[in-house]
Amino acid sequence: MAAARLQASLLTRDKNMKITFLGGGNMAAALIGGLIEKGFSAGDLQAVDLSADSRERLAARFGVRAVEALDEAALACDVLVLAVKPQQMKAALAPLAGRLGKQIVISIAAGLRLADIGRWLGGYTQLVRCMPNTPALIGAGVTGLYADPSVDAAGREAAGRVLSAVGSIVWIADEARMDAVTAVSGSGPAYVFHFIESLEAAGRALGFDEQQARRFALDTTLGAARLAVASEESPAVLRERVTSKGGTTQAALESLAASGWHDAMLAAVAAAEARGRELGDELGKD
């Protein structure tokens, strides 16, 4: 029944796809809000969370059904989004083993591999692994997705529709690259925040007050990002256009190069990817 409804909803491009969220934290709330903004009915969305506060907050804010346990009504969905913490996933999935039909199960838990999730679900394979990032909380995220080979085109489209509610999506062909997704875009906002923090500190060191320094840092970063998105040129070309020979920008960039800025960024992202692989090994242990 769920599989037939999923196929029908995708083929007709309507908004009647039934979606249940296992976990009601910030990312689940962002997805629910984004889906409603995209035209999904609150009546087609449900959330399951042990926290009474979380349930009350979701019900009050979005008008969705929010329950403490995954009952039959919540399980009668086309898509099940796993939005619990990675360390809690195994225990959360135990009651689901053997109860799933053809639902597309989407995991947004960092580090967890589909083989482990599928094993905890009793050999289930209709699985999609995703890595959103925190700008999804304001609908400006980017999410990398990987689908188990058994997931058909309709299932992939269903997963894509869910995650595109909070930003852009990028499909990854090899699950091993999901650790790289985590390193580049999942952790990426922290790198940008660190840059903003440093630019603000530099502004204050030059005499601006906190409010002025923050405004310069924030709006410069935002404007540069918007320009890069809007331009057909590469970031390298845009950088070169700002850099006049013998000018202030060249002096700044030469200082950054001398400090090892480029190599430090490469090393940081590589460290994040390596840690992601380690976490996958640790989290997947029985």
Regions found by a protein language model. Name each.
Residues D116-Q126, V142-A180, F193-A230:
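Internal alpha-helical scaffold of NAD(P)-dependent oxidoreductase catalytic cores
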Residues V128, R177-A183, P235-E240:
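Short pre-catalytic strand/loop immediately N-terminal to key active-site residues, enriched for Gly-Thr
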Residues L45, A73, D209-F216, L238, ...:
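Small-residue helix-packing motif on alpha-helices
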Residues L6, L10-E68, E72-L75, G141, ...:
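NAD(P)+-binding Rossmann beta1-loop-alpha1 motif at the extreme N-terminus of oxidoreductases
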Residues A52, F62, L70-L145, P149:
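Rossmann-like NAD(P)(H) cofactor-binding subdomain of soluble oxidoreductases
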Residues Q7, T12-N16, L218-D286:
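NAD(P)-dependent Rossmann-like dehydrogenase/reductase catalytic/cofactor-binding core
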